[in-house]
Amino acid sequence: MTRRSEGGTYPPNWHEVARQVKAEAGGCCIRCGHAHSPADGYTLTVHHLDMNPANCAWWNLVALCQRCHLTIQGRVVMERPWMLDHTPWFKAYVAGHYAALFALPGDREWVLAHVDELIDMGQGRRSALAVAV
């Protein structure tokens, strides 16, 4: 059975994708650092930053405990760059989003090496990166 949401349809391999995102986060919430521990009230979930469940790009998926998921749902989104100063964990994901928007390399290693330049580009500040790639 295909899982649906208001924003679209989850891919058929969603459970595998979500399991991988949680594993890459070390079984911990990337926002608050709590380990997955349902007995203590910390169940790890996967959040789509652009609210589109069909978009499973690495920069769009974050492992969050349910508490953080509910806190950021609809508040921390790609189109709100002012969040960057208050939310350091968010920077790499926004940089990946901008790399995709500007048709630049989107692999995690490349994006992480160019985070600040990508954010500058996304916020309308020219960068040598645009010319160099």
Question: What are these model-predicted stretches?
Answer:
Residues 1-9, 36-38, 42, 49-63, ...:
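Polybasic, low-complexity binding patches
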Residues 13-44, 65-67:
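Short cysteine-rich loop/turn motifs with clustered Cys
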Residues 14, 30, 84-86, 133:
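Bulky hydrophobic/aromatic packing residues
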Residues 16-25, 116, 120-133:
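Short helix-coil boundary/hinge micro-motifs
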